[in-house]
Amino acid sequence: HLFFAGDTGYSRDLADIRARYAARQTAAAGGGFDIALLPIGAYAPRWFMAGQHVDVEEAVKIHRDLGAKRSLGVHWGTFQLSDEALDEPPKTLAAVRLAEGIGEDEVFVLAIGETRRVRARGFVG
């Protein structure tokens, strides 16, 4: 099961999505979201962007609110849309993961051209 956030500001409503979705997805059916595609870029300045674009810390909150098994950071590094540097979001994500004890395989980004093989339930490698 895949969750795609699109452009979004942070809201605790995402925890409600988890509750409603998980109620229909039993453990026997694989339960919850296997992967969430979460935006991690185009967030600065916060006073202007907070309503439309989460920052990295909020993306990690969404990952946890959804109970996603893994999350891929998207919506960064393509073109200069906001005030943060193009390469800032993955660097910030690495720092947030370290601070919160989150593994690199749980919340991650892919480099341009990088691929990962995906099975029906989880990653191959």
Outline where the language-model segments fall.
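Cap/insert and terminal regions of metallo-dependent hydrolase folds
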Residues: 9-110
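Short, surface-exposed amphipathic charged segments that create phosphate/polyanion-binding patches used
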Residues: 120-125
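Conserved beta-strand hairpin/beta-sheet module of binuclear metal-dependent hydrolase folds
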Residues: 1-6
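Small/flexible residues
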Residues: 26, 118-119
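A short acidic, often aromatic-flanked loop/helix-cap motif at beta-alpha or helix-coil junctions
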Residues: 112-118
